Amino acid sequence: MPFFDPSARFTRSICNRGGVMSFKIAIIGAGSVGFTKKLFTDLLCVPEFRDIEVALTDISQHNLDMIRAILDKIVEANGFPVKVTAHTDRRRALEGAKYIISCVRVGGLEAYADDIRIPLKYGIDQCVGDTICAGGILYGQRNIPVILDFCKDIREVAAPGAKFLNYANPMAMNTWAAIEYGKVDTVGLCHGVQHGAEQIAEILGAKSLADLDYICSGINHQTWFIDLRLNGRKIGKEELVAAFEAHPVFSQQEKLRIDVLKRFGVYSTESNGHLSEYLPWYRKRPEEIARWIDMSDWIHGETGGYLRHSTETRNWFETEFPQFLASAAKPIDPAKRSNEHASHILEALETGRVYRGHFNVKNNGVISNLPADAIIESPGFVDRFGINMVSGITLPEACAATCMASINVQRMSVHAAVTGDIDLLKLAVLHDPLVGAVATPEEVWQMVDEMVVAQAGWLPQYADAVPAAKERLATSTVKTRDWAGAARRNVRSIEELRAEKMALKKAV
């Protein structure tokens, strides 16, 4: 990682009364209301950050108005001098910003529905579809041109040396594009490691998460607990398998992850549903999908589960907004600060308090048996000198092989997104592990044509390729199917959601 001159940081962060700092943070895609609220309250848990400026930007004025109202309520309730602004003009929001956080979803739920729906016609059943597989690759094609626009704005109007914190999926592809082509100081952030650690602490009976020490390494959504210790005692494969299989809930919800643990010898940080679509073995036939997933919650493998969840969440928030707004008028409780990395990284960079986490960066030798150009997720420490990665890590061979399959897909996908090369895009999809386990080359070629045509409005780099794709689709002989997937659930109505929430309250 690059060495940062600490004096440059001090000149840009003005210290006011009592050590309180004044600098600007911009949040792109701030219309992701729940996540933006969490980031904001986390930031205000840092005592020195209560005089900062937070500039929100989104293409939706409606969403901006909602999140601005919520954040204003928080500021008012706590009496902090924080300044909150909202802009549909992104460059205005980024002007002078020292830190830029992105949580965008280009195309929204409309395009996301195509990421799930169209591959199902070719037998490809995804739970999430936001990392690789057919849906994740097309998601990256939509996001990367916009990410590069963000980077251009950062270079031109943000503070000199501004840092870009990317939360948006597909994490590795977006971060790869920002570093390689956007030429901006970028780190990718995800919470998968933290969630996996919480599970392990629970099954091992740890009194506190602090009793658990671990090293996770790999790539985003395919990171592995390669060293695990409880109160200094090393935890091996057999003990971990036995603990998971004895747990009444995780033994059912994480069947696939437990099977991978048995075979690979290490536990994956990612959820059962996520992991199932990065591997070629568990979602290739309907009966296999039913065998390995759990329907108690979308994240355990439901077909299109995250799309359903996201749709219900959006509808619920729109309907219940007055209640969300009223609940925002509460004092900040630092004890409830989340484990999302962003606020902890900024605190370490600005105050020098050291923070340890797992970050997505360009490899450059951090993991010895993965390519130097890949975006890896691995441990690092943050202080005033920047993000400093722990180097010299070697993954178990099976983990490295699985990561390599995804890295090759990611590299082709990024290059295709930047160049608008539809043939390279098709090759990227063809080499995806799950796609390759299910679909023939002819099916992949037609599926990509269909997805590019359906999403043409969000894919400007493929404008010249769309007419020919339409012509091929008009004369195609590849058969498709009308299939909802192996484990699909309908989107619940507001009334159904309200009834379920009431029932849960009564049951407590």
Where are each of the predicted segments found?
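Long, compositionally biased stretches enriched for glycine and/or charged residues
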Residues: 205-505
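Short, surface-exposed basic-aromatic patches at helix termini and helix-loop junctions that form
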Residues: 72-76, 156, 176-186, 202-206, ...
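Short acidic low-complexity segments
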Residues: 83-96
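Internal, well-ordered domain-core segments that constitute the primary functional module
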Residues: 150-231
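Rossmann-fold NAD(P)-binding glycine/threonine-rich loop
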Residues: 110-181
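Short, Lys/Arg-enriched N-terminal segments with co-localized hydrophobic residues
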Residues: 3-20
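N-terminal Rossmann-like dinucleotide-binding module
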Residues: 25-54
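NAD(P)-binding Rossmann-fold cofactor-contacting core
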Residues: 48-72
